[in-house]
Amino acid sequence: MYYGNMKYNDIANGIGVRTSLFVSGCRHHCKGCFQPQTWDFDYGKPFTKEEEEKIAASLREDYVAGLTVLGGEPMEAENQEALYPFLKRIRQEFPDKSIWIYTGYLWEELTAEGSESVEAQPAEGSESVEAQPEEGSESVKAQPEEGSVQTEAQPAEGNSQRIFLEHRRYCRCRWTLPLLRLIDILVDGEFHEAEKDLSIRFRGSRNQRLIDVKESLARGEVVLSEFMYKEGE
């Protein structure tokens, strides 16, 4: 995996002072994207153990609230494979720090039992990451368990997220659920230039959602984070 930038003392991409990692590689190509150079999977520098250590060192500061991963697209299958062992380490070493991920994919795409699965492929010329999902965690498969009923995930009525049902995309892989279990907040949805709103917190456009990952996984439905709304809204 490559990354385009690391920001320390970032206050724009999540609650509190944060360290932010901008990974490379994105297939969304949103109109109005603020950093289209990160669409290229080979943009920037390789994300190595040295970069991991720099981020870990920054999180040891008491005033740093947590880590945010954005891009680019962290939830491209190639990036999920590289991020899983890193975020597992961060969660183990810093259990009191929050982890946020920004993705153009939808929660429904990442979690629906009936969604297609794609195998992560390393970028050409890069080494494959041999990390394994957490012991005891479920492997994410495209097919439901034998005897279970396959259901179609439905977006909220009237929600612009219905693009999920019309143009299903390939983002779910063996790393997806193990990775989601490590994070606190998922900001989902592509940037929509027509819905751009500079007044909202931690989002570029109104279609995007701040999802409480732990509550959503526990309930089996999207639970919006309290951070979704600005004060007084």
Residue ranges of each PLM-predicted region?
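Short, cysteine/histidine-rich loop/knuckle motifs that typically chelate Zn2+
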Residues: 32
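N-terminal [4Fe-4S]-dependent radical SAM core
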Residues: 1-22, 35-42, 222-223, 227
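Structural recognition of alpha->loop->beta junctions
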Residues: 116, 163-193
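Long, intrinsically disordered low-complexity tandem-repeat segments
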Residues: 115-158
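P-loop/Walker A phosphate-binding loop and immediately adjacent motor/lid segment at beta-alpha junctions
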Residues: 195-233
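Conserved Radical SAM active-site core
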Residues: 1, 35-121, 157-166
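Short pre-active-site segment immediately N-terminal to redox-active cysteine/selenocysteine motifs
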Residues: 25-29
